[in-house]
Swiss-Prot record:
One of its GO terms (cellular component) is cytosol. Binds 1 [4Fe-4S] cluster per subunit. The cluster is coordinated with 3 cysteines and an exchangeable S-adenosyl-L-methionine. Its cofactor is [4Fe-4S] cluster. HAMAP family: ThiC. It comes from Ralstonia nicotianae (strain ATCC BAA-1114 / GMI1000). This is Phosphomethylpyrimidine synthase. Belongs to the ThiC family. The gene is thiC. Zn(2+) binds at residues 437, 501. Substrate binds at residues 239, 268, 297, 333, 353-355, 394-397, 433, 460.
Length: 631
């Protein structure tokens, strides 16, 4: 898929043309780990390395497996038809459980109206099937199965995906050195110590305890299951969505594909413009990753934008509408209570959450308690009928570092803990949303408070941004906070782009934001000691020392940018096998000099004494040449 162009796709036909070209990763192949059944094949990406050249000949370097979020879009053997959607990967698994029914029609009044509206017929996804719902009295959540001791195909899928089958590589000599890593410090997390410890039973236990979720609506059958939890790899979320002034359906699908190409583990559709229902349908039918929404946005749209006119009945219908489309998790701001709203009065930035401000306005206008809070049990009944996970929203998150960790923020957090317990009584999966803007020295307190008051439910944070002085660079200010809070225990990081606070991001901004957050998440995995996390670092470091430039590019998170930066100063093809870069040049490359010393030592029997002798001779040569570092 061409990445140089920043212009959005004008139509589904033009986007289809791009997808037909595939967005092949350099030197990579799509590989699958086989599960316990023929229809359980877990994807990963394998990066091929070139050989190391030595005086004695070539030494082969092994391929490196990496976690892959791109779904079938990067599989050359799969034909993608956007108008038909992706293959129904989970349909058989769900059907086999025997606890759901296929509905004769949509349950939502709004959904039915959209399905029969001639004005939107040209926008409608044509290949729709009737939605599923739990049988009366049944609970179809992954937490419910886990608490009954059932290991679902989704749980097995997650175990294989998280381990990357690294246990099969441990006894191979070519991987032994590459698989070494520093011990991590996990702040009390229950991390698996070895790849073989990441079993389906381990996943089941984490889901049953509420420490992790598998967001997987029974109506999102195209989904490749993944886990969000403190004791798994740190995940990242990317946002997309139309607004009143921008975007077409094709553009939003393109943003989704673009985001997962660069590594987004989940996508939140934050659409607030026209055709929200149709946009979401197209995204879901073509998405291999979980999709989250903020249902209050669409409910508000149904009132014409008047928060005071929101009703529980309208919101309930919106939940059912979206659940029957297949949304995997809902952000619900049920912790914005009437008594907390006055606590924001002395803040510099007040209430910055859109959902939080909507509910605060409703509470004040009616002088009633938040209807999301008072109807929470009814919301849980809907969630467990479709296996939609809660993302309990932080509607009172701080919008600047001056407002961080105040009474409003933590008061809401404690209420979210209360609601977590209530959701778990229904066996509904929960994660907790967090800030926001927090200076570095106050970041860990956010994690500690969440773990204590929300009982280790997965934490999902927006950054946090650790300073407010860098408009245009908030992917960096937030990436710093994200790496730290990920290390402390946050399970998923919501990306921030360079356009944060300034405007709507384009494709390159999205790419920049995702790569920044992949760095933060990986740094956190290294710090907490996720098994095998250092493999890619070690492989790239070895390639760097051996001047295998193509491998350096290909093993990186953004091969295109790395290659482009290198070629700005050394564009010739020969430079990609040269034993220097433009930073030091051929005479002063530290790695080249070190290799020369090693080679010299090897010629003198390659023992420690010879290495020391080699250094002494180099010292004599250096002094004879005038002892000048620069000439």
């Amino acid at each position: 898929m061409p990445q140089a162009k920043n212009a959005p796709a004008a139509s589904f036909d033009s986007l289809q043309t791009e997808l037909d070209q595939k967005f092949a990763y350099p030197a990579s192949s799509k590989t699958y780990i086989a599960g316990s059944r023929p229809d359980l094949r877990v994807p990963m990406r394998t990066i091929k390395q070139t050989a190391t050249r030595t005086d004695q000949g070539e030494m082969l370097n092994p391929p490196i497996p990496v976690y892959d979020t791109s779904g079938p879009y990067s599989d050359p053997d799969v034909h993608i038809d956007l108008k038909a959607g992706l293959a129904p990967l989970r349909a058989k698994w769900i059907d086999e459980r025997g606890d759901t029914v296929v509905l004769p029609s949509l349950s939502s009044e709004y959904g039915q109206a959209r399905a029969h509206d001639p004005a939107t017929a040209h926008l409608r996804f044509a290949q729709l099937t009737n939605p599923r719902r739990a049988k009366p009295g049944a609970n179809v959540s992954q937490m419910h199965y886990a608490r009954r001791g059932i290991i679902t195909p989704e749980m097995e899928y997650v175990a294989l995906r998280e381990s990357l089958n690294l246990q099969a590589l441990q006894d191979k000599p070519e991987y032994r050195k590459l698989l070494k890593q520093h011990p991590g410090f996990s702040y009390g997390a229950n991390l698996p110590q070895r790849p073989e410890d990441i079993t389906p039973e381990f996943v089941r236990q984490e889901i049953a305890a509420g420490r992790a979720i598998i967001p997987a609506n029974i109506n999102h059958v195209e989904l490749e299951p993944m886990a969000i939890g403190r004791n798994f790899r740190v995940k990242i979320n990317g946002n997309l969505g139309n607004s009143a002034v921008t975007s077409s359906l094709a553009e939003e699908v393109e943003k989704m594909v673009w985001s997962i190409r660069w590594g987004a583990d989940t996508i939140m559709d934050l659409s607030t413009g026209k055709h929200i229902h149709e946009t979401r349908e197209w995204i879901l039918r073509n998405s291999p990753v979980p999709i989250g929404t903020v249902p209050i946005y669409q409910a508000l749209d149904k009132t014409g934008g008047v928060a005071e006119d929101l009703t529980w009945e309208m919101f309930r219908d919106t939940l059912i509408e979206q659940a029957e489309q297949g949304v995997d998790y809902f952000t619900i701001h049920a912790g914005v209570l009437l008594r907390y709203v006055p606590l924001t009065a002395d803040r510099i930035t007040g209430i910055v959450s859109r959902g939080g401000s909507i509910m605060a306005k409703w509470c004040l206008a009616h002088h009633k308690e938040n209807f999301l809070y008072t109807h929470f049990d009814e919301i849980c009944e809907i969630m467990k009928a479709y296996d939609v996970s809660f993302s309990l929203g932080d509607g009172l998150r701080p919008g600047c570092i001056a407002d961080s960790n105040d009474a409003a923020q933590f008061g809401e957090l404690y209420t979210l803990g209360e609601l977590t317990k209530k959701a778990w009584e229904h066996d509904v999966q929960v994660m907790i949303e967090g800030p926001g803007h927090v200076p570095l020295q106050r970041v860990q307190a956010n994690m500690d408070e969440e773990l204590k008051h929300c009982f280790e439910a997965p934490f999902y944070t927006l950054g946090p941004l650790v300073t407010d002085i860098a408009p245009g660079y908030d992917h960096i200010t937030s990436g710093i906070g994200a790496a730290n809070i990920g290390w402390y225990g946050t399970a998923m990081l919501c990306y921030v782009t360079p356009k944060e606070h300034l405007g709507l991001p384009d494709k390159e901004d999205v790419r920049e934001g995702i790569i920044t957050y992949k760095i933060a998440a990986h740094a956190a995995d290294l710090a907490k000691g996720w098994p095998g996390a250092q493999l890619r670092d070690n492989a790239l470091s070895k390639a760097r020392f051996e001047f295998r430039w193509e491998d350096q590019f290909n093993l990186g998170l953004d091969p295109e940018k790395a290659r482009a930066f290198h070629d700005e100063t050394l564009p010739a093809e020969g430079a990609k096998i040269a034993h220097f870069c433009s930073m030091c040049g051929p005479k002063f490359c530290s790695m080249k000099i070190t290799q020369e010393v090693r080679d010299y030592a090897a010629s003198l029997d390659a023992n420690a004494t010879a290495a020391e002798h080699g250094m002494e001779e180099k010292s004599i040569e250096f002094r004879k040449a005038g002892a000048k570092i620069y000439s």
